[in-house]
């Protein structure tokens, strides 16, 4: 069974407040997206990479990210949709004819550059034996359910996990889940949710608190500290 990475990076990054989309901001001298792709390019597990970005950014991404950094595993750069879910579906459809039904697809945020080879390996192994694998970390803070500014519930922290990526599935499973959601016009908050609603079980894989998604200026400060430790 082959393993393919699907990297959605079609977001506009409004919360970052930058003049360019967040995936192209420099982190240790390289665009964040390039840092992320580098992990999958170097991984012996990964056979190919599909990147999903806004249609008007495809030439820039090809020249300034993929070709400039020599990412030979990138099979296709796909135009994204209005929502992340549509972008992932576009990527899955682009894999048709390349990915087999039982091949593993690692869906990973383009602005989450600190994922490790260990996490990729455990997510892949879990997806091969289950309906899906969700990388996550236990919640450290108490979480409150709030309605109209009033606390209505305090879930047990022991049952709460914070979802990260990659989220890993066999191609046939995740393609079917996305096609059903698209047909029913259902918009989920992540890929695992679409698989769960079909009655399938997704198993948790322990992630890493450093596997952050860079969304805000505060995240960028944290990422810069991490990259300083990582670089020689």
Curated annotation (Swiss-Prot):
Q: Which UniProt keywords apply?
A: Isoprene biosynthesis, Nucleotidyltransferase, Transferase
Per the UniProt record, the site (Transition state stabilizer) maps to 15, 22
InterPro entries the UniProt entry points to: IspD (IPR001228), IspD/TarI (IPR034683), IspD/TarI_cytidylyltransf_bact (IPR050088), ISPD_synthase_CS (IPR018294), Nucleotide-diphossugar_trans (IPR029044)
**UniProt cross-references to Pfam families, sorted A to Z:** IspD
Record's catalysed reaction(s):
2-C-methyl-D-erythritol 4-phosphate + CTP + H(+) = 4-CDP-2-C-methyl-D-erythritol + diphosphate
Q: Does the keyword Lipoprotein apply?
A: no
> What stretches pass through the bilayer?
none
Role description: Catalyzes the formation of 4-diphosphocytidyl-2-C-methyl-D-erythritol from CTP and 2-C-methyl-D-erythritol 4-phosphate (MEP).
Q: Which PANTHER family match?
A: 2-C-METHYL-D-ERYTHRITOL 4-PHOSPHATE CYTIDYLYLTRANSFERASE, CHLOROPLASTIC
Similarity-based family: Belongs to the IspD/TarI cytidylyltransferase family. IspD subfamily.
Its recorded name reads 2-C-methyl-D-erythritol 4-phosphate cytidylyltransferase
Organism per entry: Geobacter metallireducens (strain ATCC 53774 / DSM 7210 / GS-15)
- Tell me the lineage of the source organism: Bacteria, Pseudomonadati, Thermodesulfobacteriota, Desulfuromonadia, Geobacterales
Gene label = ispD
């Amino acid at each position: 069974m082959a393993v393919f990475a699907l990297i959605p990076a079609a977001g506009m990054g409004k919360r970052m407040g930058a003049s360019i989309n967040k995936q192209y901001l420099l982190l240790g001298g390289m665009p964040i997206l390039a840092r992320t792709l580098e992990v999958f390019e170097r991984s012996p597990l990964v056979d190919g990479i599909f990147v999903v970005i806004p249609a008007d950014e495809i030439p820039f991404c090809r020249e300034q990210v993929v070709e400039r950094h020599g990412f030979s595993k990138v099979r296709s750069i796909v135009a994204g949709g209005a929502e992340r879910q549509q972008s992932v579906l576009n990527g899955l459809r682009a894999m048709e004819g390349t990915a087999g039904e039982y091949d593993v697809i690692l869906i990973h945020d383009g602005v989450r550059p600190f994922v490790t080879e260990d996490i990729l390996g455990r997510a892949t192994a879990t997806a091969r034996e289950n309906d899906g694998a969700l990388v996550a970390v236990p919640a450290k803070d108490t979480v409150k359910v709030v309605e109209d500014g009033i606390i209505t519930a305090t879930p047990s922290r022991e049952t709460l996990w914070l979802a990260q990526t990659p989220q890993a599935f066999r191609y046939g499973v995740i393609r079917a889940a996305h096609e059903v959601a698209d047909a029913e016009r259902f918009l989920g908050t992540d890929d695992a949710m679409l698989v769960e609603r079909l009655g399938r079980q997704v198993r948790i894989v322990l992630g890493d608190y450093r596997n952050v998604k860079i969304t805000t200026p505060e995240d960028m400060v944290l990422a810069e500290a991490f990259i300083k430790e990582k670089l020689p």
